[in-house]
């Protein structure tokens, strides 16, 4: 209950017994033993739905991300309504969605990555995605995706996908760089009139091709060693034969 009050005539006004608030209902938070303190159980975004409080594992940023704001390492989904500047690094255990333009940054997503305005990599950018990648465009970027890749265009990028690589939209083009699509590559325009070297590889993962090249090199080295051993044995046999003839 509250405290008694006094009216303008000095008469006491008795306090009414207050009505306790019902406990909060929802998810994503813990309640103290006395029921008076609520603490978030996870990092994320608070939303209110009528009489329910829900903390979602989402980090939402309404501006740009750069070296000044600091890098991001989050256990859920990350949504950025601005751009991501050069030198920034964003890592999310789940999906990443970026509305603005990305420039020379590093992005790591445990699920999907959505780049609504593409990536200007400047040779500094790297993308690592466990799910699928959706991008408007990519330039001068290293890309590793476990799922499929869907974009409008790629210029001088190294793209590796364990699934299919699909280029559609206005340009639907690959110009320069290397693109590996284990399950196939769909593209309308490959290379350009300037004869920029453009490589596409279908059916074999880049890492497997590298491993095969390493094994082939190892075989060549072993063969050279074997040839040297055989030449040495032959030389010894000749020396032993000459010694026997002299006896």
Put a short name on every predicted segment.
Residues 155-160, 169-184, 191:
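Long, internal scaffold/assembly segments composed of regular secondary structure
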Residues 1-146, 152, 178, 189, ...:
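Charge-rich, low-hydrophobicity low-complexity segments
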Residues 165-167:
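Phosphate-interacting basic helix/loop segments used at nucleotide- and nucleic-acid interfaces
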